[in-house]
Amino acid sequence: MVSTHNRDKPWDTDDIDKWKIEEFKEEDNASGQPFAEESSFMTLFPKYRESYLKTIWNDVTRALDKHNIACVLDLVEGSMTVKTTRKTYDPAIILKARDLIKLLARSVPFPQAVKILQDDMACDVIKIGNFVTNKERFVKRRQRLVGPNGNTLKALELLTKCYILVQGNTVSAMGPFKGLKEVRRVVEDCMKNIHPIYHIKELMIKRELAKRPELANEDWSRFLPMFKKRNVARKKPKKIRNVEKKVYTPFPPAQLPRKVDLEIESGEYFLSKREKQMKKLNEQKEKQMEREIERQEERAKDFIAPEEEAYKPNQN
């Protein structure tokens, strides 16, 4: 067979963007037949998102109807479902619809989440809850990702061209694939105790180097800073003891009560062996109940709804 590799290709000009994703239109479905099987995806959402989802669900339905995707909001089970219909012509739009409901469940506002239906937009939900076992350390590192007044997060958004939302045990990101890769690296390293400022400096240098065409085919590692991890032991503050001089008394200290004396005083001494065991069990159960109530209150703090701006529905 004759090779066509070295032949002239007059249609292949430099102004053609070969990486551009062409929009899939209805006429591109040559057969015109509906899909052989129905595809559907379902995701659960937390209780505090219920009121917000009810207010925006008409807009969600309207946005998905343009792509012939059906959606169902089940407030009893706390779930959102998307599925293809007989009119659906784009085989990949169901995956975009799945990402839409996933972002809505993770507290992403609807005006931002609906952009995922565009071809040039992708998303990534990064789980950060499993990196650190200590709750206080986890909260500290998550706050480090946000930064003072959200400055660290804004810098990352500008450098990666992604929308980033930190919520609970996840970080939701939307943007191009190249930016999402950088966001995941920064977030995971931050939870591994590597400060985001190091990555921000690196991304700023890369952005400046990308403006110079003569460095397009060169290795940039010589321009990037190399940070060494240093574990410096902190000096522990000296404990100052408050030693007060005791007043001298010639009399010996009073004798401490024995265990039997305490039992006689409380009346436990006169109980039978079985009654003592029952009393001990009841005390243990009361302590367990108190601990369980404290744990439930601690867990409930994670499900407090974040402050959101009031959503104004689209009148058009």
Swiss-Prot record:
InterPro entries reported in the protein's UniProt record = KH_dom, KH_dom_type_1_sf, KRR1-like_KH1, KRR1-like_KH1_euk, KRR1-like_KH2, KRR1-like_KH2_euk, rRNA_assembly_KRR1
RNA-binding: present as a keyword of the record? yes
Q: Per UniProt, which keywords does this protein have?
A: Nucleus, Ribonucleoprotein, Ribosome biogenesis, RNA-binding, rRNA processing
In its keyword annotation, does this UniProt entry include DNA damage?
no
Q: Which Gene Ontology CC terms are recorded?
A: 90S preribosome; nucleolus; nucleoplasm; preribosome, small subunit precursor; small-subunit processome
Cite the KH domain residue spans from the record. 122-192
Subcellular location(s): the record lists: Nucleus, Nucleolus
List the residue ranges of the region (Disordered): 279-316
Recorded GO terms, molecular function? RNA binding
**Compositional bias annotation for Basic and acidic residues:** 279-304
Q: Which GO terms describe its biological process?
A: endonucleolytic cleavage in ITS1 to separate SSU-rRNA from 5.8S rRNA and LSU-rRNA from tricistronic rRNA transcript (SSU-rRNA, 5.8S rRNA, LSU-rRNA); maturation of SSU-rRNA; ribosomal small subunit biogenesis; rRNA processing
Described by its record, this protein's role is as follows:
Required for 40S ribosome biogenesis. Involved in nucleolar processing of pre-18S ribosomal RNA and ribosome assembly. Essential for vegetative growth.
Note in the entry: Present with 4340 molecules/cell in log phase SD medium. Cold-sensitive mutant KRR1-21 is a deletion of amino acids 234-239.
State the family it belongs to: Belongs to the KRR1 family.
Oligomeric form and interacting partners: Component of the ribosomal small subunit (SSU) processome composed of at least 40 protein subunits and snoRNA U3. Interacts with snoRNA U3. Interacts with MPP10, KRI1 and with ribosomal proteins RPS1A, RPS4A, RPS4B, RPS8A, RPS8B, RPS11A, RPS11B, RPS13, RPS24, RPS25, RPL4A, RPL7B, RPL8, RPL23, RPL25 and RPL28.
The name this protein carries in UniProt is KRR1 small subunit processome component
Which organism is this entry from?
Saccharomyces cerevisiae (strain ATCC 204508 / S288c)
